[in-house]
Amino acid sequence: MSLISAAADVNDASSTTSAGSVRSSAVYRKDGKPLSQEALYRAQQKYGVFQSPARQTGSGLKDSKMASDVAANLANNNRTTIEAYKRVLDSNASRAATAVSSRSRSSSVTSNATVVTTSSKSTNAAVKALSSKPVEQPVAPKKSNMNMSKILVGAEAAAEKRIGIRMKPEKIVYVPSKESGKAAERSMSLTPEIMDKLKTKGDYEAEAEVEADPKKYASKAAFAVRDFDPNEATEKELLEREKKKQAYFGMLTSPQVLSLARANAQVKLDQIDKAAPGSLYKNEEFNKLAVALAQKNSTKRSEHHGKINMGGGLWLTQADVQNIAQGLITPVLDEVDSRALQQRAIDEDIKQRKIDFKEQNAAWIELQRNKLSNDKMYSRETRMRHKRETEGLHARTERKFQDLCASKDSEVAEMEKALQNAKDSYAALQKQMEEDLEKERLRVEAEVAALKKEQEEDLKAARVEQEQELKPYVDDVKAAEAEHERLTAERDSLNKEIEELRASIESHKVRIEELDNEISDSAAKHEEEEGKREELTKHKEEFDQEVSEKFTVIAQAAKEKAQKSSEEARLKQLEVDAMINERQSELNSTELELKKEKLSLLEAMRNVTELKGEDKLDENRVKALIGMTSEEFIAENNKSVNVSDDKFEPFNEHTASTKSIKHEEGVLGEGGAKTNSDELPVKDSAEKSSEHLNSTAEKSIEPAKASSPYPAKPSMVDAVLPKDFKPEVKPKAKPAHKTPQQGAAAGGEPASAKSGVKRSPSLKQKFMGIIKGDTKSQSKPAAAATPVHPPATVKKAAPKKAAASSEADTPAKVSPAKDTAKTEIQKIAQGGPAPAPEPEHKTAPAVDNATTKSVSTLQKPTNSGIDKSEIHKIAQGGPAPTSGHSNHTRTSVYENGDNSDDEDELPDSSEAGENGIGADKKGSLFKEVF
């Protein structure tokens, strides 16, 4: 709903009447129709001048009906400056008004009637007054004195009212509206200090109750006259007049004469008062003056008949006011109309955008549902394909293992025979050595007995000689004992320190014992590990040493060379794909820019046509500029929208990479097959190539994201959603249903999952020829497919440091090549399965959202699958064995139909291999890949 309804929609017959005219006038409208009641209400609400019964807001004029005329007059004057406030009331006005109002009527009459003369005849005025007769003299009519007390009282009341209004102005409560907040900000800011100073309605009511208390009238009156001085209120003129009056009274000789004079004067004054009303209308001069004045006033009134007094001597007719008002208000009303039309257009656009958003949201939900169904189908297909490949590989590995065991058993028998011969010779040699040792022992015992007897005789003679020589030394020993006692006391003092040191040593010993226990525990663990290792290498030490030191290294070198050549070929292939995708994206972006320019040109021409007031575009000119009419261009553009959305929609699903399954059991082989340490460099190179492929695919997809055509009218969804979010709207027509086999048999062109329409392969597919319609190969068992082995070139083996770095990337601890080979041979000897080769998956570039290609790449042979003769050939510089391997990869294309029977089916846990060994790790692998 717009803010202001159109004035044309309301049939309002109200009209305004001015003083002196009865006709209905056009209130600020060119077409003669007045404004609607809603428009007037909105305008009053916007500017805060709406008068409600609950709040009386004055317009500043006595007659509120003249407010519009005064506003028009002020607008005509166009006063851009506001004069500063000036105090028009004199500070002595209230004092003068009080003094005048206090004067009585009698004092003023007496003072006016009393005339003091200084002539020489004043002394005998009383005698003449008694003797003379009253003579009637013609008295000229005088104007009656104006009663100034009423005028001054009114002026004082008006002044007090104006002062009260200025001191306590009326508070204006603005009506809430869109502009009320801005107007309040422009006028003033209601800070907390100002809000505290403002009085509320309750404050005013409390003050009124206090003022209305009759007990406080006397105190208020006394407070009002606290500064009043009656002596200052009398004027100097009155004081001088009273002094002269008293001096005149003092000159009179008799009070009787004064009383008689007063009586005569009063009689004359009464006669004048009685005669004035009768002579007023009979006086001819008065009548002439009245007629002249009436004619003059009538002439002045006739000059401004039918005009409006604008104040300040300005009189305008109703037509002039209408012209001024139309010149000022019409642009505002036109702007209101234009904004109302714009608001209606915006409301309509919002409504249409909501409809478009709902449709696009429904399409996006449908797209997500199809994505989930495709994920289920792809996971089931991948699981079945892995099962087929694993069964064939297991059979071949068992056959090779049996042959290897037969050959190695014969070699072990020969080595055991040689070992028995060596043991026999060792026993004979040991017997001979025991006889020689017995003879030597008897000879040594005889020599020792003779030597012992001779030494005893020499010892007796030496003892006698020693006693004689030691006698002087005995005395020295006694002296030393005395010294020893002295040192004993010193030793006791040192023992205390020693005890303290021993306590510290004991604490260190406790810590040493703890460390010894830890060392013993670690030694026990080490011995346990050594026992396990010796158990594995008990009977086959010489054979394992030969394999680990010579044959394993040679086989690993050959494998590294083969893998390197394969990765180089893949790198070349990916570089070619990246170049093709880059050129395709540049071509698409150029076509998109051309369409945008054409579309902007059509938009500009349409705007020019609307401004000119024409209904249709100049199709001849449009055809001359862009080569086709506007309808043809729009139809072609809409057609290209669907094609571009289907063709360049990014496909982010990848098959299982080597990195994601290399540590999972139960995927390629049963019985817990483990990854060999010599395959780690191959995994690293495969991971690097997959990362390079992902980055290349992302670069080629980025221009395709922006390939959606520029819409003729911007949408709210385009402004809110990200640029790469362009959901495909599903067409209403139901497509023809196809099975994956039927789609693959239709010439190798993938069918769309949405519409079922065959789409031509992309430029990359045409150039490289990747898609091959080989549907028969998919129905064959997996055992028919032989593992691919790339040609190996004779190069230097990878350095040990690189191998160590690749082994360090694996999460599990990898033992040296020697221990690994021993462990695998021990498993083979115990009847376990041979370690299965690890498959490597390469993600092909996505062609369509519903089409994917799962490419099974090179299968790497294991150490157990290489014959000894082949290893000697590789060591001598010969070519790597290629028997049993093919030099090509197979590409399987799967298509998704709309009527797939297993869209909502969950993976069946009853399939073969699902509940076997490593089933839980298969589930985790499924979550990681999809």
Swiss-Prot record:
Spell out the residue ranges making up region: Disordered: 1-34, 98-143, 516-544, 637-930
Q: Polar residues bias located where?
A: 849-866, 883-894
* Locations listed in the record: Cytoplasmic granule; Cell membrane
Keywords, A to Z, come to: Cell membrane, Membrane
Q: What is its main location?
A: cytoplasm
**Residue ranges under compositional bias (Basic and acidic residues)?**
523-542, 676-691, 721-731, 919-930
Q: Where is the composition biased (Low complexity)?
A: 13-27, 98-129, 703-715, 740-755, 781-804
Topology in membrane: Peripheral membrane protein
Q: Which Pfam families match?
A: Eisosome1
Q: Name one GO cellular component term.
A: plasma membrane
Feature: compositional bias, Acidic residues: 898-908
A GO BP term here is:
eisosome assembly
Function field: Required for normal formation of eisosomes, large cytoplasmic protein assemblies that localize to specialized domains on plasma membrane and mark the site of endocytosis.
The record's comment on protein family reads: Belongs to the EIS1 family.
Protein name, please? Eisosome protein 1
